[in-house]
A protein has these predicted regions:
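Contiguous, well-ordered beta-strand patches that form the walls/edges
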Residues: 26-39, 53-120
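N-terminal helix-cap/turn-to-beta initiation motif at the start of protein domains
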Residues: 9-25
Length: 136
């Protein structure tokens, strides 16, 4: 993106999109109230790379885990993101989520397709939501 993060002409969503660009390391995952569960999506150190509205997730060895697109809406509170995976069991599904960008941390909570978008930054057993924390 050729535009600057602080450009007052940009919408809040465009500024957040610019801030997301590049690579982020996964530092934690909570799924259904379980911290860092086994499985591919719980891999600490997995790298997510954002380019425009496209994302790619790779293991520390470089194997492709997941990819797709996303749409941000920073005009609502909490800020909303909708993920659409292009591979795997959720391929083509729109996954409602919320996010926050705090310095070098990107935190988001995603629900399953058809579920309500999360409304707070907290998950627990039986909620079928995932909290992911990524760091630059």
């Amino acid at each position: 993106m050729s535009q600057l993060f602080g450009d007052p002409q940009l919408s809040a969503s465009d500024r957040d999109l610019a801030a997301l660009q590049g690579s982020w390391e996964q530092v934690s995952l909570e799924a259904d109230g379980i911290s860092n569960p086994p499985g591919d999506l719980g891999l600490r150190g997995a790298l997510t790379t954002f380019r425009d509205n496209h994302f790619v997730v790779r293991t520390t060895e470089g194997a492709l885990l997941l990819e797709g697109t996303f749409v941000l809406d920073a005009s609502v509170s909490p800020k909303a993101i909708t993920w659409t995976d292009s591979m795997g069991p959720d391929s083509g599904k729109q996954l409602p989520a919320i996010y926050k960008l705090e310095g070098d941390l990107f935190v988001f909570i995603a629900a399953d397709e058809g579920a309500s978008r999360p409304s707070m930054f907290r998950t627990g057993p039986g909620q079928t939501m995932r909290t992911l924390v990524r760091r630059r």
